[in-house]
C-alpha cells in the first residue's frame, strides 16, 4: 500500500510529486509534496487541479530570517501550531495567483540573492516554518517536506498541497491510494519517514563517563545527550560487554515516585533494584535508565493520571482521558545508546513484549526475554492486572 522512503526520494530528485500521509490520530490527511528547488508551473497546476488544497512552501527558519518573513499571527491558536508566515508574491508577478506566477514566487524565494523587499505582502504563496529537528520533533507535513528535501540533497524547502476529494471532503487513505494509482505517484507515511531518519541518523552523543559505586556494586556510568530534546539518559555498564556474546540488558524508564520515593502504586522501584542486583550477580550487563517518566507523559501528567485512577479509571483509561496513548515511549534513542555501547544481541530483562518489538525494530536482536516480576502489593494489584489485560505484559498474577 505504501512505498519505501528510498523510492519516494528517487522520484523527488527527478522533480516528481509524492503523496505523504500523516497519522490517523493527527490530521489524517495526505498532501502532495514536491521539492521547491525543482518546482515548475506544471507541478503547481497539477497540485491545484488534483489536490485542491492550499499551496504552501515549508522552509527552514533561515529562509524566514533572511527574507524577513514574520509570523502570520502573533498568537497561534491552530491545533497543530502550523507556523504560517505572512503570505507573499514576488514583485515581478502581477496578480500572483496563476500557476506560472506562483512557481515564480517559489523559485525567487529560494534565490540566495533575494531580499525581503523583493516580495509583496500579502500574497498567494504561504511559507511555513519547519521545526528544527524535522519530523523527529513535529510529525507534520511541513517538517516532512523539509526533511525530504534535505535527504535528497536539495535546498531545504518543499511545496505542499492538501488533497481534497471532488465532493469537497478530505481525502483519507483509501482515496489517497486511488489517487496514487491514478497518477502513478509514490505514497509514503510520516511514520515511515520518522523510522527512516531514526535508522539512518545518529541522534545520541556520549558526553561523560565515570565510575559509580552503588549499593548493588560498582558500575561504569555513561551519560548521553540526544539531539531530539533536552532529555539526558544514563547507562550503567558492568563488566566486559564487548565479547560479542548476548548481554543481559534492562531498559528502565524513569519513575521518580517508584524509583526514589518507593511508591507502592507501581513495581518500578523494585524492578530497578532487582535488575541492578541481577546484573551484578552475572558480572556483566547494562542497565539503561531512560528519562521517560510516566511511560513518556512526564511527571505532572503522571500525577494527573494517578488522580484519575483515584476516581476509578485504570492506568490506560487515565492516560487516554488526558489525551495520551496508553504508552508514549519510543525506544529509538535507547536503541542507539545500546548500539553505541557495541551491543547487538540482548537478553532483555522485561515483562513487556512491546519493548522487545520496539528494540528489535532498530536492528537489535533480543534472543531471550528474562522475566522481571516483582511481588504484587495490595496498592498495585489492579495496576498490574491492567498492564496484563490492556498492555499485554507477561505477568503471573
UniProtKB/Swiss-Prot annotation:
It comes from the Bacteria. Keywords: GTP-binding, Hydrolase, Lyase, Magnesium, Manganese, Metal-binding, Multifunctional enzyme, Nucleotide-binding, Riboflavin biosynthesis, Zinc. D-ribulose 5-phosphate binds at residues 26-27, 31, 138-142, 162. The record marks 124, 162 as: Essential for DHBP synthase activity. GO terms for cellular component: cytosol. Mg(2+) 2 binds at residues 27, 141. Pathway: Cofactor biosynthesis; riboflavin biosynthesis; 2-hydroxy-3-oxobutyl phosphate from D-ribulose 5-phosphate: step 1/1; Cofactor biosynthesis; riboflavin biosynthesis; 5-amino-6-(D-ribitylamino)uracil from GTP: step 1/4. Residues 200-397 are annotated as: GTP cyclohydrolase II. Binds 2 divalent metal cations per subunit. Magnesium or manganese. Binds 1 zinc ion per subunit. It catalyses: D-ribulose 5-phosphate = (2S)-2-hydroxy-3-oxobutyl phosphate + formate + H(+); GTP + 4 H2O = 2,5-diamino-6-hydroxy-4-(5-phosphoribosylamino)-pyrimidine + formate + 2 phosphate + 3 H(+). The active site is at residues 327, 329. SUPFAM superfamilies: RibA-like, YrdC/RibB. GO terms for biological process: riboflavin biosynthetic process. In the N-terminal section; belongs to the DHBP synthase family. In the C-terminal section; belongs to the GTP cyclohydrolase II family. This is Riboflavin biosynthesis protein RibBA. It comes from Bacillus cereus (strain B4264).
